[in-house]
Design a protein with these regions (language model features):
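Conserved C-terminal beta-signal and adjacent last beta-strands/turns
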Residues: 8, 252-254, 264-266, 307, ...
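Short acidic/polar hinge/loop motifs at secondary-structure boundaries
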Residues: 107-137
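Transmembrane beta-barrel wall of Gram-negative outer-membrane proteins
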Residues: 180-207, 216-284, 310-312, 373, ...
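Flexible loop and strand-edge segments within Gram-negative outer membrane beta-barrel domains
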Residues: 250-256, 266-327, 338-360, 408
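Surface-exposed extracellular loop regions of Gram-negative outer-membrane beta-barrel proteins
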Residues: 283, 294, 338-342, 396-400, ...
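Signature of Gram-negative outer-membrane beta-barrel scaffolds
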Residues: 379-484, 506-507, 620-621
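Gram-negative outer-membrane beta-barrel transporters
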Residues: 430-431, 435, 443-444, 547-550, ...
Length: 737
């Protein structure tokens, strides 16, 4: 009850402060969003908090990856285990408790794990037209996993010509950065005719080893550098040297390319057809935090890398606005995706290199319909089908003898199915009051075959599991006058267990191994939120949202047994057996607040603060801080914008997480955190000062420069396995036509 009272107190205090302000000004809160209902809607009719990042905002900041793009909002905390990482954390939830949607297609797969993921970096920030984040459960519209929030990415779409003359357009960008020696090149070009158009986009990025700052905890300095060294037919003699460059974080560099191709055909104004092809691939890249693990005073691993992360999507989309008795608008979306990832590890001075490779083939089909029954009443309904085919292989290679062997795969061979139907109603009973309610039924099925896993299991090798889930939401949005917006919403979300939950074998931390559990059931989240927004003329906007989420039947890691034993030999070490189980409840409450101001004609200020308090139940009944509830964090910016010039000073910050407030699971990861006087892991507070400038040299040509972390702070955001860049100068030039 303590954290509920804290959240209520903060919300009431901020509410009172806003109420005391003058509300005689007139405003118009008419931003268009699609995240809440899967259809374009005015944000003033939605009962949930939605944040939008448009193309212009993203383009002016030039983020390196889509993960960095999300952090621009100041409302999403991004965790990185390595430089090639990016794991969004929203309202105390992350990974497979968040939903990723790309052009209306579900990106989450059956192997999205509870540990940190980096699938979002497969998206190209240069090719994203807009990003919307729906905070809180969005299960009615999006199904399983949408517990903490939904990230809706809309990529660039081919434009059509409004005249008989073809329209040709495009953009090209070159960018470099000093902290990692980055080079990025991007180009997209499109042509539009009266009824059809196409768009081609390509981006290539090369990042070197990342350099951290010089002022901060010495615990973040890399002690040793390992150079793998072996001769086929002879021996292994890996070279370990003392790191003499305190800024260097190696190995951490990687490169990546993205391709997008779209075709569009619109025979008339009421019918639109699109085909899209996306492909993304990284190079092999090191998991930096694992390279910091020590054993007997030396690095444990000579190699610990992720293999190339690949993502491909073929998508066809049909949109129709030919009104009839069933619908006024219709969208049909079909997609086929392929995901490939792998993990490659070899211990120091050992000859066995283990590779676990995964491939997921994901088929999906969505149909969404909208019917405006009355001017004040709209009905949205639809259905979804998803199928994931999972293939997992474990292979060992002796680097001396070149002999191969079978090692444990990460997952069994499996298939995961999800089928859902939903309906939502939006009603405006009186002017300035909108009420929304929705209901969804979802059914999932998992079929697993452990005979290919490379180890024996204490249950039948062929397993099947299925269950149904009901989710719902009801909320209202009230605008008592043109300057006010108030939201109240209740939503229930769910997460069906996937192949990663039920079938994974992996080491979660030093001395622990997680084993399969095919008997898991869905977990459920109940969320209530209250949001208030007030706009004073054209110069000031204040937005405050308080929320509380209760997670029941939570899937958590607990000590267990495997084949009757509490320990299991894994990678040459006797490890304590753990298993994911429906064994806990978790609670998260928090406040998100924002302020946007314009003054003195050309100046602006904006700020975002986020406070969350999470607790989850341990196996002994005690409470621990929630792992994905980040410490207090936010962003502030003061800028000047006039005609061709924009100059902005901005600050990013995070509060401390003291040792006694660290989640139990994080306390074991001493290799990635600073250590206090007692040798306990903690996450220090930090703040950075940054400066950026944009200058439109002439029509179509823009120069962007940024000086990040001016004080050269050595800092590491909470739960990250690698430090953020030290002082970093970036420069980019963009030409658009």
């Amino acid at each position: 009850m303590k954290y509920i009272k804290q959240a209520i107190f903060v919300v009431i205090s901020l509410f009172s402060a806003v109420l005391s302000a003058n509300d005689s000004t007139q405003v118009d809160l008419d931003e268009i969003v699609i995240a809440a209902s899967r259809w374009h809607q005015n944000i003033h009719s939605e009962p949930v908090k939605v944040t939008r990042l448009g193309f212009e905002t993203t383009n002016s900041y030039n983020p390196q990856t889509a993960a960095d793009m999300l952090s621009l909002s100041g409302e999403i905390f991004v965790q990185k285990s390595q430089y090639g990482g990016g794991n969004p954390m929203i309202r105390g939830f992350a990974t497979n408790r968040l939903l990723y949607s790309v052009d209306g297609v579900r990106m989450n797969t059956a192997i999205f794990r509870s540990g940190n993921i980096q699938n979002v970096i497969s998206l190209d920030p240069f090719a994203i037209a807009s990003t919307e984040v729906l905070f809180g459960p969005g299960a009615v519209s999006y199904g399983s996993d949408a517990i903490g929030g939904v990230m809706v990415f809309s990529t660039l779409s081919p434009q059509l010509s409004k005249t008989e003359k073809p329209q040709v357009y495009g953009s090209a960008t070159l960018r470099g950065a000093t902290a990692s020696g980055e080079f990025t090149g991007h180009a997209h070009v499109g042509a539009g005719f009266k009824k059809w158009g196409f768009l081609t986009s390509f981006t290539y990025s090369k990042f070197g080893d990342l350099k951290q700052g010089t002022c901060g905890p010495e615990d973040y300095i890399q002690k040793y550098i390992v150079q793998p060294n072996y001769l086929v037919g002879k021996s292994v003699n890996d070279i370990v040297t003392v790191n003499t460059n305190e800024r260097l974080q190696t190995p951490s560099g990687y490169d990546q390319f993205n391709i997008m191709q779209k075709f569009r055909y619109a025979p008339n104004q009421r019918l639109n057809l699109e085909y899209a092809f996306h492909y993304s691939q990284t190079s092999e890249y090191a998991r930096y935090d694992r390279h910091q693990r020590m054993r007997n005073g030396l690095p444990r691993y000579a190699e610990w890398n992720y293999g190339p992360q690949k993502w491909m999507m073929n998508q066809t989309k049909l949109e129709s606005s030919r009104s009839n008795v069933m619908y006024d608008s219709l969208k049909v979306n079909g997609a086929f995706q392929i995901f490939e990832e792998s993990r490659i590890s070899r211990e120091l001075n050992k000859s066995l290199r283990e590779t676990q490779s995964e491939r997921v083939e994901a088929w999906s089909a969505n149909i969404d319909l909208r019917k405006d029954v009355l001017t004040s009443l709209s009905i949205f309904y639809g259905a979804e089908y998803v199928q994931n085919n999972v293939t997992s292989i474990g292979e060992g290679l002796d680097v001396v003898t070149n002999e191969t062997s079978v090692v444990a795969s990460r997952y069994p061979k499996a298939k995961w199915y999800s089928m859902g139907v939903y309906t939502q109603v939006e009603w405006e009973p009186i002017k300035r009051l909108n009420i929304a309610a929705g209901l969804r039924y979802n059914h999932y099925l998992i079929s697993s075959d452990y005979s290919t896993a490379g180890y024996e299991v204490p249950f039948d090798e062929k397993q099947k599991s299925n269950a149904g889930s009901v989710s719902a939401n009801i909320g209202l949005n009230w605008r008592p006058n043109r300057g006010w917006l108030m939201r109240l919403n209740y939503a229930r979300g769910f997460r069906a267990p996937n192949v990663d939950d039920m079938g994974k074998l992996f080491d979660s931390a030093d001395g622990y191994v997680t084993v399969p559990n095919p008997s898991l059931k869905p977990e459920y989240a109940d969320n209530i939120e209250l949001g208030l927004a007030k706009k004073f003329g054209t110069f000031l906007t204040i937005d405050v949202t308080g929320y509380y989420t209760h997670l029941n039947n939570a899937i958590v890691r607990r000590n267990s047994t495997f084949n009757g034993s509490e320990t299991l030999s894994y990678e040459g070490e006797d490890c304590r057996v753990q298993m994911l189980q429906n064994a806990a409840v978790a609670n998260v409450c928090g406040v998100q607040a924002g302020l946007d101001a314009k003054f003195a004609k050309w100046f602006y200020f904006n700020g975002r603060i986020n406070y969350q308090y999470g607790r989850e139940e341990l196996d002994n009944g005690e409470k621990s801080p929630s792992r994905h509830a980040a410490p207090f964090f936010g962003r502030m910016a003061l800028g000047f914008k006039h005609e061709k010039v924009t100059v902005e000073a901005y600050s990013l910050y995070q509060g401390a997480c003291r040792a006694e407030n660290m989640p139990e699971e994080e306390k074991q990861k001493t290799e990635i955190y600073a250590l206090d006087a007692n040798g306990n892991a903690y996450s220090p507070a930090w703040i950075t000062i940054n400066l950026r400038a944009t200058y439109n040299i002439y029509k179509g040509l823009t120069l962007n420069t940024t000086l990040e972390n001016i004080a050269d702070k050595r800092y590491r955001p909470y739960s990250c396995g690698i430090s953020a860049p030290g002082i970093n100068f970036t420069v980019s030039a963009t030409y658009s036509f």
